[in-house]
Amino acid sequence: MRTENTATLNLIWGALILEELARIGVQHVCMAPGSRSTPLTLAAAQQTKLKRHLHFDERGLGFMALGLAKASRAPVAIITTSGTAVANLYPAIVEAWLTHVPLIVLSGDRPPELLDCGANQAIVQPGIFAHYAKQINLPTPDAHIAPQALLTTIDEAVANQTRPVHINCMYREPLYPSELGTPILDTESPYLKPLQTWLQLSRPYTQYGKYKQVSNPSDDAIMRFVHGKGVIVAGTLTPEQDPQQLIALSQKIGWPLLTDAQSQLRQHPAAIGNIDQLLQHPKARNLLQEADRVLVFGGRLLSKRLISYLAEQHWHSYWQVLPEQNRLDPSHNAKHVWHANAAQFTALNWYRSSSANWANTLITYNDELHNLFVRNIDHGEFGEAQVVRAIANTRPLEQQLFIGNSLPVRLYDMYAPVSCCTATTYTNRGASGIDGLLATACGLAAHEGKPTSLIIGDLSQLHDLNSLAIAKSLASPLVIVILNNDGGNIFNLLPVPNEQVRNDYYRLSHGLEFGYAAAMFNLPYNQVDNLADFQDSYNEALDFQGASIIEVNVSQTQASDQIAELNLWVKQS
């Protein structure tokens, strides 16, 4: 292969980048069409170690990559052309940065001489993601730059990264080689001669050891910490942290475990899952105010009542366990932060508390709320909370559950049922936007083909409508449950001072339904208005090998009215 040709050298650099990323652990590459990224696109087309995913909209593509990275627990590469194509990744990059999800953006770019001079589709791309991505700027491919220098640059940029990396790749024309040789990384190429050993192996050129800072308390510190009335709080926890170990820890110490919607433990029968509602239950709140020690795993709590409880309580000792060095406490409590994941921290030598079982009455109160929700939600009027509970109760071991922002995730946090088993649960609660939710769910479903359910609001679905094209490409079950209350009815729960203002400037009623959208993308579609029909449609959709839509139409005030009614019941308990 001749390397003096610009198009050929561009292609070699693209192939070196993708080969090294595959060796580092990347399994998926998400690609949008474009000309300036051609060296990366052609290299990806021949790369057999990566699974390719294509979509025409970079915003949805970025969120699909986010879902793939969440599910695979490995970095995912994204290829885009130059210009606003890169900018459209910004929302997904922000979400990934805040939640420590590794995405690797490979953006094609114009060479330096075509920037700031009116050249077509040319913007300043380095630094486009501000502090939400590590930035690497590659020069235009040059035969005088050793290929091993390119590999070590990639290795250093990506190794041990838990957050997004932006690798900006400048290419001069011509971009398209006259012929596409196989393989691109030809062992006979003089340019690749320094990499002969690397080409014959399958490991990265530079192998970085795993870097993980872990800090643990001493046995004496643990003994002093558990000496008193305490609570354990499970915040946002990923499946690989083995959150189930918190159940055993709670039982060993003798402290109640209060669980957030994102903890993987919200429905566990041994946890106090209804904590959001219990904090407005007078007897339960009075009991919880006796606690003077708290052990928090993770952060990004959903319940404002739980956040307020942690902020207002006078803690003798406040410990927080985080896998990364973050500040995840908007209340700025005085505390000791330990760097470890939940599995590591629960494996320490824990002692029985001197006040073990001090809050056992919480179990009774939690059961009271369980019975209240069965009676008033499951056997009450058809509505959003009833559907959320039905999904959470249906075949959980078979599937993964992605819960959309705004009202759906709050309904799950407030009213999820107790269950012997729970689906693996995902959310996008870093920046908590309503964009890209369907695309993220598509990424989750695409990784291994596990049946996946998405609970999403109508405005969120309208926001991500063209990601139905990604959903259409799936060959495994993705059940898209749209809770259509005709607008942003989360604002019914907020103190907007005037109903007309609420309707005109916050709720944004649209009067739309999603049947025609389903037809446009040729997706199976059902609209339901009762629980029996929903359950029949839902079970059928879980068995369908592809994406399907179930639309649940309710009034604008159904959920908010029911929440107000249930709040009244709880407060009078």
Curated annotation (Swiss-Prot):
GO biological process: menaquinone biosynthetic process
Cofactor(s) of this protein: Mg(2+); Mn(2+); thiamine diphosphate
Keyword terms, alphabetized: Magnesium, Manganese, Menaquinone biosynthesis, Metal-binding, Thiamine pyrophosphate, Transferase
Presence of keyword Ribonucleoprotein: no
Cofactor binding: number and manner: Binds 1 thiamine pyrophosphate per subunit.
Gene3D superfamilies (UniProt xref): 3.40.50.970, TPP-binding domain (3.40.50.1220)
Reaction(s) catalysed by this chain's protein: isochorismate + 2-oxoglutarate + H(+) = 5-enolpyruvoyl-6-hydroxy-2-succinyl-cyclohex-3-ene-1-carboxylate + CO2
GO molecular function: 2-succinyl-5-enolpyruvyl-6-hydroxy-3-cyclohexene-1-carboxylic-acid synthase activity; magnesium ion binding; manganese ion binding; thiamine pyrophosphate binding
Known EC number: 2.2.1.9
Tagged with keyword Metal-binding: yes
InterPro entries: DHS-like_NAD/FAD-binding_dom, MenaQ_synth_MenD, MenD_middle, THDP-binding, Thiamin_PyroP_enz_TPP-bd_dom, TPP_enzyme_TPP-bd
Domain of life (superkingdom): Bacteria
Pathway: Quinol/quinone metabolism; 1,4-dihydroxy-2-naphthoate biosynthesis; 1,4-dihydroxy-2-naphthoate from chorismate: step 2/7; Quinol/quinone metabolism; menaquinone biosynthesis
Quaternary assembly: Homodimer.
Protein family: Belongs to the TPP enzyme family. MenD subfamily.
Described function: Catalyzes the thiamine diphosphate-dependent decarboxylation of 2-oxoglutarate and the subsequent addition of the resulting succinic semialdehyde-thiamine pyrophosphate anion to isochorismate to yield 2-succinyl-5-enolpyruvyl-6-hydroxy-3-cyclohexene-1-carboxylate (SEPHCHC).
NCBIfam families referenced in this protein's UniProt entry, alphabetically: menD (TIGR00173)
Protein name per UniProt: 2-succinyl-5-enolpyruvyl-6-hydroxy-3-cyclohexene-1-carboxylate synthase
Organism listed in the record: Shewanella sp. (strain W3-18-1)
Gene symbol of the encoding locus: menD
